Amino acid sequence: MKRTYPEPTPIYHITHIDNLKGILRMGKLLAHNQSPPKQRSIAYAHIQERRNRAKVPQPPGGVLHDYVPFYFCPRSPMLYAIYSGATEYQGGQEPILHLVSSAQAVHKAGLPFVFTDRHGVLSHARFFRQLEELAQLDWEAIQASYWADPPELREKKQAEFLVYKAFPWALIEEIAVYSQRVGEEVLKILKQFPEARRPRVCIRKDWYY
């Protein structure tokens, strides 16, 4: 069943504010297998192990950890896990940034990418390479405000857009934050890198729990 998808199609990468300087210094987000060791992790350790083994069946291939991951929605189940203290990271959601771009911007830049119809570690996840195949995703599930049940709804909400090896900072269009305090800190960090692209910084509490 084909479904209408938003065009442009926003994509969202979440990261801790402590990682922002490193991203700006390098001028890009790096895939886990390309990353320097001093990144502040907000992920489940056991899921990271699975991502390092989960093979990507579409070109350019490799494993999930060879890609920079994005969701198709803010306020993801992963952010809820952070908010509720379910991950090894215990710093809460306030320091978490949403870095926003679009699938079309990635395509226009000629970057290798794939995307999935649900959480990428699942054995029954389907992988796609063509933007028109975004219509294969369950956009009602992706945009759902309540996703705890049934389990398949949660799986589909966590569909992923995966960019091979690195994602240029120049393609980030917005940095969404939880609070004015974090927004001001982001602006201070951006000022330290005057040659880098300056995305808009927006307080979006409705993207958080």
From Swiss-Prot:
<feature type="DNA-binding region">
    <location>
        <begin position="44"/>
        <end position="50"/>
    </location>
</feature>
<feature type="site" description="Specifically recognizes first thymidine of consensus sequence 5'-TGTC-3'">
    <location>
        <position position="154"/>
    </location>
</feature>
<feature type="active site" description="Proton acceptor">
    <location>
        <position position="51"/>
    </location>
</feature>
<feature type="binding site">
    <location>
        <position position="51"/>
    </location>
    <ligand>
        <name>NAD(+)</name>
    </ligand>
</feature>
<keyword id="KW-0808">Transferase</keyword>
<dbReference type="InterPro" id="IPR029494">
    <property type="entry name" value="DarT"/>
</dbReference>
<dbReference type="GO" id="GO:0016779">
    <property type="term" value="F:nucleotidyltransferase activity"/>
</dbReference>
<feature type="region of interest" description="ADP-ribosylating turn-turn loop">
    <location>
        <begin position="116"/>
        <end position="160"/>
    </location>
</feature>
<feature type="active site">
    <location>
        <position position="160"/>
    </location>
</feature>
<comment type="subunit">
    <text>Interacts with cognate antitoxin DarG (via C-terminus); this heterodimeric complex neutralizes the toxic effect of DarT by preventing ssDNA binding to DarT and consequently inactivating the toxin by direct protein-protein interactions.</text>
</comment>
<feature type="DNA-binding region">
    <location>
        <begin position="145"/>
        <end position="148"/>
    </location>
</feature>
<keyword id="KW-0238">DNA-binding</keyword>
<feature type="DNA-binding region">
    <location>
        <begin position="75"/>
        <end position="80"/>
    </location>
</feature>
<comment type="similarity">
    <text>Belongs to the DarT ADP-ribosyltransferase family.</text>
</comment>
<dbReference type="GO" id="GO:0016757">
    <property type="term" value="F:glycosyltransferase activity"/>
</dbReference>
<dbReference type="GO" id="GO:0003677">
    <property type="term" value="F:DNA binding"/>
</dbReference>
<feature type="binding site">
    <location>
        <position position="30"/>
    </location>
    <ligand>
        <name>NAD(+)</name>
    </ligand>
</feature>
<feature type="DNA-binding region">
    <location>
        <begin position="154"/>
        <end position="158"/>
    </location>
</feature>
<comment type="function">
    <text>Toxic component of the hybrid type II/IV toxin-antitoxin (TA) system DarTG, which plays a crucial role in controlling bacterial growth and bacteriophage infection. In case of phage infection, DarT toxin ADP-ribosylates DNA, which inhibits both viral DNA and RNA synthesis and leads to abortive infection. ADP-ribosylates ssDNA on the second thymidine of the consensus sequence 5'-TNTC-3'; the protein does not auto-modify. Arg-51 is highly flexible, allowing it to assume multiple positions in the crystal structures. Its toxic effect is neutralized by cognate antitoxin DarG.</text>
</comment>
<keyword id="KW-0548">Nucleotidyltransferase</keyword>
<feature type="binding site">
    <location>
        <begin position="13"/>
        <end position="15"/>
    </location>
    <ligand>
        <name>NAD(+)</name>
    </ligand>
</feature>
<feature type="binding site">
    <location>
        <position position="22"/>
    </location>
    <ligand>
        <name>NAD(+)</name>
    </ligand>
</feature>
<keyword id="KW-0328">Glycosyltransferase</keyword>
<protein>
    <recommendedName>
        <fullName>DNA ADP-ribosyl transferase</fullName>
        <ecNumber>2.4.2.-</ecNumber>
    </recommendedName>
</protein>
<dbReference type="Pfam" id="PF14487">
    <property type="entry name" value="DarT"/>
</dbReference>
<keyword id="KW-1277">Toxin-antitoxin system</keyword>
<feature type="region of interest" description="NAD(+)-binding element">
    <location>
        <begin position="35"/>
        <end position="53"/>
    </location>
</feature>
<feature type="domain" description="DarT">
    <location>
        <begin position="9"/>
        <end position="209"/>
    </location>
</feature>
